[in-house]
UniProtKB/Swiss-Prot annotation:
UniProt keyword Phosphoprotein, yes or no: yes
Modified residues (Phosphotyrosine): 471, 736, 740-741
Protein name from the UniProt record: Discoidin domain-containing receptor 2
Catalytic reaction equation(s): L-tyrosyl-[protein] + ATP = O-phospho-L-tyrosyl-[protein] + ADP + H(+)
InterPro entries associated with the record: DDR1-2_DS-like, FA58C, Galactose-bd-like_sf, Kinase-like_dom_sf, Prot_kinase_dom, RTK, Ser-Thr/Tyr_kinase_cat_dom, Tyr_kinase_AS
Major place of residence: membrane
Family: Belongs to the protein kinase superfamily. Tyr protein kinase family. Insulin receptor subfamily.
Post-translational modification: N-glycosylated.
Positions bearing carbohydrate: 121, 213, 261, 280, 372
Length: 855
């Protein structure tokens, strides 16, 4: 029966993958309340054109709230076609809004006012206001029919806005009152407009017309489109057949914006993107149609130019040629690396490869390039990761999805029936054999329960256990499987304290340590890797947490007023990570730890901050993270310097290195044989020196049975003289959002760095950290110029892990970097071995890198 939970686990992981949208913003997921009903939007950000009295002011227009007189009510009755009255909400930052909710004034049964209809106006800058319209041009939305029911309305298409106005509409003179809520999520792209040539018409054989215009563009439209957003940012990716559409009741071709080669005199289409501020760009993803049988292909090359604020376009463009695909007609995302270029505007020229070029989505992975030191710390909450009752599943492509799920379920049921039938007959045979043998002999077992463990295939002695990972099992369908039906005994049950732990990501102890010198791996069943402040959390043995739970934190309390905030590095559901500068840190640090600066000089530190509105579980997890960090004492692991836990917001202060993370550091450098004379280089010796330090830090973590779970160059900080320290907040940074795969809002996974067993079985171990080290080593020797498996989509990466599991020689490995010697690439390949017990330990990796350095 061990296969049944395994197969169900794999199905559980794959179902969200099958149904997940391919666009960066998925309207089916981005449906979180933005703070009217919950109170996160403050009163001063809710304004109105007028109010009937102080008790019906704008601040009382919160959905499902009975404060004041129960709603916002304008001063005078609303007249037909008189659109002067409005309720306005300022979100302070751009948001992707997919749903609105309205309600009238009930006031405990005393109110009878409501708005039967309303319009939505929105603005991204507070000056230019846009009237929302649906895909057929209708602007008026149906409102409430009574004063108490909540009426939810999908915005199709969704909008990107900072300011939103609700404008009540009536067909006769009447008093109206409104309570409202907005649903959506933060608009992380930062894109405020794109300018492009207007889309065109595709005429099919027979005369049918496919309209490929941007029908919901909210800017000016003529021969070109200017100062607006539309279908390229609506979160809906087009189908393989551009004559079909995801959306109901719209015309064929709606999902795509398309251009004909003849309309472009230079052989390319130029699109200019304007952003909210200067940003650091990692990648651009373009969803393209490739129905080459109808003359449609992805672009053959793109050239992108960059501009900061009102300056001229920079002359050195990024050029990215593509390998055309004349075999697979599927639509796909094309990822274009932007090499951390800084800009507030990007102009891209997409070159035709055939008669037509069609796009359905364009997204950017970026982070703000700088932060204003005088800005107040943000207080707006992040979208919760818990299940939202408003969440709706994208019903597009429903029949195909249902067919796939039904087929998978039938296959699983058939396998389960076969296994149960086999076990039934096996028990019958066992009973018969027992009856025959009971008169002849008695079999008794005297193995001590605290020093033996049974695998699925055989009983194991202590010496055997130490060398086997607990997920390296022999499956029943393999010929070498033998079931010891007469000798299987029940495993000892866990005590309640061992079975459950209050710290997310804690490893459950599966066996005692073997003899000294025999390595074993800590093992954890983990789905969500993210901590409360957005970074990954270490997977820690339960026995270690039990020891830490009774200890006080041996770290000094630091005066909060001495922190000077420089930049926000990242954020999570309940907290943020900031880059700060402090003076006088030497008075508070551990006496055994030396700061890498001269005395009395300011020190750069990373501050993890828990927001004051965090719940009790988040606070407990944050304090446990402090206890874990306080135990880490290694020169290649960031050090916990001090804490601020006497009052809110709780903070932990850790080291930060002057050269930032290794990913950005290497992307600013080139190999020593580079032809560029104006770019700094890093020698092969220094690359190996940094890799050796990463191995040393991971060797220390593995000695504690700690599992990092997100080892990558983005989580390695670089100091003076190429010193390296391993950190844990890369996951919180929007700059690296493209490195993570989000499964229906439940988990954020770095799948391009994860081992096959981590993706398919949810197993995170020291062995899976070894796999990630191999990918990190590959990043280092490629100078972080591209993502691992950049030629594969996220779905193809997951498919490739299945090939590693099947081990039939069809798996794809990362290629050998140009400056990487054979010995180092051989080490990488050993980290990616299918069987975990065949991968090297970090002690072996560290020793091997040291020996190579001495050659």
């Amino acid at each position: 029966m061990i296969l049944i939970p395994r197969m169900l686990l794999v199905l559980f992981l794959l179902l969200p993958i099958l149904s997940s949208a391919k666009a960066q913003v998925n309207p089916a997921i981005c449906r979180y309340p933005l703070g009217m009903s919950g109170g996160q939007i403050p009163d001063e950000d809710i304004t109105a054109s007028s109010q009937w009295s102080e008790s019906t002011a704008a601040k009382y227009g919160r959905l499902d709230s009975e404060e004041g007189d129960g709603a916002w009510c304008p001063e005078i009755p609303v007249e037909p076609d008189d659109l002067k009255e409005f309720l306005q909400i300022d979100l302070h930052t751009l948001h992707f809004i997919t749903l609105v909710g309205t309600q009238g004034r009930h006031a405990g049964g005393h109110g009878i006012e409501f708005a039967p209809m309303y319009k939505i106006n929105y603005s991204r800058d507070g000056t230019r206001w846009i009237s929302w319209r649906n895909r057929h041009g209708k602007q008026v939305l149906d409102g409430n029919s009574n004063p108490y029911d909540i009426f939810l309305k999908d915005l199709e298409p969704p909008i990107v806005a900072r300011f939103v106005r609700f404008i009540p509409v009536t067909d006769h003179s009447m008093n109206v009152c409104m309570r409202v809520e907005l649903y959506g999520c933060v608009w992380l792209d930062g894109l405020v407009s794109y300018n492009a040539p207007a889309g065109q018409q595709f005429v099919l054989p027979g005369g049918s017309i496919i309209y490929l215009n941007d029908s919901v563009y909210d800017g000016a439209v003529g021969y070109s489109m200017t100062e607006g957003l539309g279908q390229l940012t609506d979160g809906v990716s087009g189908l393989d057949d551009f004559t079909q559409t995801h959306e109901y009741h719209v015309w064929p071709g709606y999902d795509y914006v398309g251009w004909r080669n003849e309309s472009a005199t230079n052989g390319y289409i130029e699109i200019m993107f304007e952003f909210d501020r200067i940003r650091n760009f990692t990648t651009m993803k373009v969803h393209c149609n490739n129905m080459f049988a109808k003359g449609v292909k992805i672009f053959k090359e793109v050239q992108c130019y960059f501009r900061s604020e009102a300056s001229e376009w920079e002359p050195n463009a990024i050029s990215f040629p593509l390998v055309l695909d004349d075999v697979n007609p599927s639509a796909r995302f094309v990822t274009v690396p932007l090499h951390h270029r800084m800009a507030s505007a990007i102009k891209c020229q997409y070159h035709f490869a055939d008669t037509w070029m069609m796009f359905s989505e364009i997204t950017f992975q970026s982070d703000a390039a700088m932060y204003n030191n005088s800005e107040a710390l943000p207080t707006s909450p992040m979208a919760p990761t818990t299940y939202d009752p408003m969440l709706k599943v994208d019903d597009s492509n429903t029949r195909i999805l249902i067919g796939c799920l039904v087929a998978i379920i039938f296959i699983l049921l058939a396998i389960i029936v076969i296994i149960l039938w086999r076990q039934f007959w096996q028990k019958m045979l066992e009973k018969a054999s027992r009856r025959m043998l009971d008169d002849e002999m008695t079999v008794s077992l005297s193995l001590p329960s605290d020093s033996s463990m049974f695998n699925n295939n055989r009983s194991s002695s202590p010496s055997e256990q130490g060398s086997n990972s607990t997920y390296d099992r022999i499956f029943p369908l393999r010929p070498d499987y033998q079931e010891p039906s007469r000798l299987i005994r029940k495993l000892p049950e866990f005590a309640p304290g061992e079975e459950e732990s209050g710290c997310s990501g804690v490893v459950k102890p599966v066996q005692p340590s073997g003899p000294e010198g025999v390595p074993h791996y800590a093992e954890a069943d983990i789905v969500n890797l993210q901590g409360v402040t957005g970074g990954n959390t270490y997977s820690v043995p339960a026995v270690t947490m039990d020891l830490l739970s009774g200890k006080d934190v041996a770290v000094e309390e630091f005066p909060r007023k001495l922190l000077t905030f420089k930049e926000k590095l990242g954020e999570g559901q309940f907290g943020e990570v900031h880059l700060c500068e402090v003076e006088g840190m030497e008075k508070f640090k551990d006496k055994d730890f030396a700061l890498d600066v001269s005395a009395n000089q300011p020190v750069l530190v990373a501050v993890k901050m828990l927001r004051a509105d965090a719940n009790k579980n988040a606070r407990n997890d944050f304090l446990k993270e402090i206890k874990i960090m306080s135990r880490l004492k290694d020169p290649n692991i960031i050090h916990l310097l001090a804490v601020c836990i006497t009052d809110d917001p709780l903070c932990m202060i850790t080291e930060y290195m002057e050269n930032g993370d290794l990913n950005q550091f290497l992307s600013r450098h080139e190999p020593p044989n580079s032809s560029s004379s104006d770019v700094r280089t890093v020698s092969y010796t220094n690359l190996k020196f940094m890799a050796t330090q990463i191995a040393s830090g991971m060797k220390y973590l593995s000695s504690l049975n700690f599992v990092h779970r997100d080892l990558a160059t983005r989580n390695c900080l670089v100091g003076k003289n190429y010193t390296i320290k391993i950190a844990d907040f890369g996951m919180s940074r929007n700059l690296y959002s493209g490195d993570y795969y989000r499964i229906q809002g439940r988990a954020v996974l770095p799948i391009r760095w994860m081992s096959w067993e981590s993706i398919l079985l949810g197993k995170f171990t020291t062995a899976s950290d070894v796999w990630a080290f191999g990918v990190t080593l590959w990043e280092t020797f490629t100078f972080c110029q591209e993502q691992p498996y950049s030629q594969l989509s996220d779905e193809q990466v997951i498919e490739n892990t299945g090939e590693f599991f099947r081990d039939q020689g069809r798996q794809t490995y990362l290629p050998q970097p140009a400056i990487c010697p054979d010995s180092v690439y051989k080490l990488m390949l050993s980290c990616w071995r299918r069987d975990t017990k065949n991968r090297p330990s970090f002690q072996e990796i560290h020793l091997l890198l040291l020996q190579q350095g001495d050659e």
